[in-house]
Amino acid sequence: MRRMLINAIEIKKLRIALIDGQQLYDLNVENIDKKQRKSNIYKGKIVRIEPSLEAAFVDYGEKKNGFLPLKEISRNYFPNNCSNYRHLHIKNILKEGQECIVQIDKEERGTKGALLTTFISLAGNYLVLMPNCPHLEGISRKIEGIDRFHLKKIISMLMVPENMGIIIRTSGVGRSIETLQLDLNFRVKNWYTIKKSAEINTAPCLIHKESNIVIRTLRDYLKKDIQEIIVDNPEILELARDYMFNMNCSYFEKKIKLYTGSDPLFSYYKIESQINALLRRIVKLPSGGSIIIDYTEALTAIDINSSQSTKGVNIEETAFNTNYEAVREIARQLRLRDLGGLIVIDFIDMSVLKHQKMIELHLHQVLQKDRARVQVGSISQFGLLEMSRQCLGSPLKKINHNYLFEMQKC
């Protein structure tokens, strides 16, 4: 049985876990005393143009200026008489002192400021509104086959405002055109409110704050395969119920329950130990093998070891079976630890080319469950595979990563 567990008893931390039986498969954590800025929208002011980087630095109201690269500037800011957009330089588009509406794409990290974009996105239950992307009619890459074909027809019937675009989310599959239009209308109204706020306020300032972790998780993860939603805080329970009522999600209202047990919620469902295990460098595999996860400034390295693995009658078969088993666990660890950036996997050497291709295919398959954008390479002659993953940015996971990195230096 798949469940969503919302642990909101602690004053400074709110945690949401998704479990299948007793196995944790996704985790969202928010520290209440730490600001969440990702996806917030600001009215900012250009403070410096850097031609050598083809980027601008934007004061959006925080201590560090944000970084706005040329590729993240929508054509709304381009000169009206421009006929060749591809050869424009940033100094021909933006000027120091100019005001702009920006959204945080990546949180600031270390000495680096936040990565900004002018391609605003407003996520709804079933679709994403892109107000600066004219004529965009996108469908989630995870939607395939007949569902994709059916949604292409529905998109053409939706009343999308001129000069705006949309992307249908996986949760939009099977929804009626009326439901999708209602969600779209709500996002459009939200965008007009944001624009109005930008008109009446002086830069730099916050003009739209992303929803809290409870609403975000319900919006992004709530699907019909979730059979129970269990909350240990009555106030959060009512917040979730109100959201479901407002979004016409009556299907889930019967599934949400208040937890009143004497044991802590996560301990009762035996996932606290799984969360604590995310601090460990070594992850054991059922067959006796293991994966070792090391964090560096440049990349994350994942090493697969056969150790005491009993899967196989010879070296080649043991290597293939251990690698195959490790791939599923690696995909799970990427989600739970929210590993982002460059990731290098060191597989156990396999001499059979067919085995290497099967491992690559298996990795692609298990990564389809990941909400983050992922790019995967091929296994090299040295047994290494390079991939990149979008960091979705849970604060506690970042703290865990920093803790591990410091421990490795000791």
Curated annotation (Swiss-Prot):
Enzyme class: hydrolase
Residues noted as binding Mg(2+) in the record, renumbered to the chain: D303, D346
Residues of the S1 motif domain: 39-119
Record-linked Gene3D superfamilies: Nucleic acid-binding proteins
Entry EC no(s): 3.1.26.12
Main subcellular localisation: cytoplasm
Compartmental location: Cytoplasm; Cell inner membrane
Listed name of the protein: Putative ribonuclease E
Provenance organism: Buchnera aphidicola subsp. Baizongia pistaciae (strain Bp)
